[in-house]
């Protein structure tokens, strides 16, 4: 025989269930909107750090408290002239230069130099026969404007990034070319910090050690 208290508890549970589900849905929506969001990788531009169809988790809150840092992988809303499809298209690239940084290609060993310090980039794409992408396919010497970022894909030869848009810019002056090639910090959605799918590729997306040696930009 079921006692009266048990019946009351069961009845209370079923009455509260819709409220609990509603709260759970609201929390999930708020987390997705303001804290964490998943993204899939649609192109080879970040191989082999990120492969096509990898799923990454993005922290959307971190840049409310600080600016993006060199070496971090960020998701951002692509500038209009970067887009190939729908308006508001999301891109994912690695931050190479932050405001005030002088980014130069290249030193004697064909490495980028940031604020006078050469940068080792072991993550740059290498194909099946061991041929490594060039760091860049042309020389350049730029200073990142305030409020903007210079971003590049790890698969340099397959990435529509700051270098490509610098090369393709139709601006008639250097400042205009750099504006065309950089993205605004305000356009950054968040930092990709882990690959979580497929499970065989699960890993943290930490900042490579080479960035530790880069000095601050002049005046910082």
Model-identified regions with their sequence ranges:
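Soluble "head" domains of membrane/secretory-pathway proteins
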Residues: 2-14, 18-19, 30, 34-40, ...
């Amino acid at each position: 025989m079921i006692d009266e208290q048990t019946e009351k508890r069961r009845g209370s549970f079923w009455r509260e269930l819709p409220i609990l589900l509603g709260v759970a849905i609201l929390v999930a929506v708020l987390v997705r909107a303001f804290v964490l969001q998943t993204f899939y990788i649609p192109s080879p531009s970040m191989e082999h750090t990120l492969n096509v169809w990898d799923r990454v988790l993005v922290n959307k809150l971190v840049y409310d408290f600080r600016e993006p840092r060199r070496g971090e992988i960020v998701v951002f809303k692509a500038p209009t002239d970067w887009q190939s499809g729908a308006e508001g298209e999301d891109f994912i690239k690695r931050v190479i230069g932050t405001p005030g940084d002088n980014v130069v290609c290249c030193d004697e060993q064909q490495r980028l130099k940031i604020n006078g310090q050469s940068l080792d980039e072991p993550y740059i794409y290498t194909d099946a026969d061991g041929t490594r992408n060039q760091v860049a396919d042309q020389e350049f010497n730029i200073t990142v404007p305030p409020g903007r970022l210079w971003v590049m894909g790890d698969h340099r030869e397959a990435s529509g990034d700051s270098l490509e848009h610098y090369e393709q810019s139709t601006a008639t002056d250097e400042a205009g070319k750099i504006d065309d090639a950089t993205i605004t910090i305000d356009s950054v959605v968040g930092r990709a910090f882990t690959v979580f799918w497929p499970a065989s590729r699960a890993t943290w997306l930490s900042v490579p050690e080479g960035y530790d040696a880069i000095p601050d930009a002049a005046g910082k």
